[in-house]
Amino acid sequence: TEYLKSTDRMQKTIVFCASEDHAERMRIALINYNSDMVKENPDYCVRITGSDVYGKSKLDYFISVSEPYPVIATTSELLSTGADCKMTKLIVLDKTVESMTTFKQIIGRGTRIREKDGKTHFVVMDFRNVTRLFSDPDWDGPIEQDEGFRHGASKPKGGSHGGDGKNPPDDPAETPIVDRAGCKVKIINK
């Protein structure tokens, strides 16, 4: 949500979750964090999984070039293969992926470029450190990271997080929590 708020809240996003239950919990969390967008359209965020009849009914709208909603789809397996998600600009990995084939299929959801429709790139947000398992520099080329990207830099002056609108506030350094897979963990609610 923070990334979408700092870039484009209407960019098509797929969140890959560990299970259908996880996809439902993620959908609820994203609805809570994006309640203003959900008020505009209740289908801003939907779960699209094999057992979700309502979500599956929204699949054609999600993959459509001309339909703005749904914007965020949470899923476990259904969107991994076979869905031509033409306008997906953000792929979020919140599940462990151990198969190179599955990984490439998931990433493939974002690779469709449609310059005439405004789709020139896509972003992978990896919360499980999956991308390091499938690093193939000979095939993929060097990893591009925007070193100039500053989280929250587009927030309005005098925002709720302090700072002057140009520079982030002087927050005390937090000691990161690292899980067994080496991923940094951020607790957002206790």
Regions found by a protein language model. Name each.
Residues V38-E40, Y44-A153:
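Conserved RecA-like P-loop NTPase helicase motor core
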Residues T131-K190:
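Long, largely alpha-helical accessory region at the distal end of helicase-like NTP-driven motors
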Residues S6-T7, S66, A181:
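Short coil/turn helix-boundary motifs
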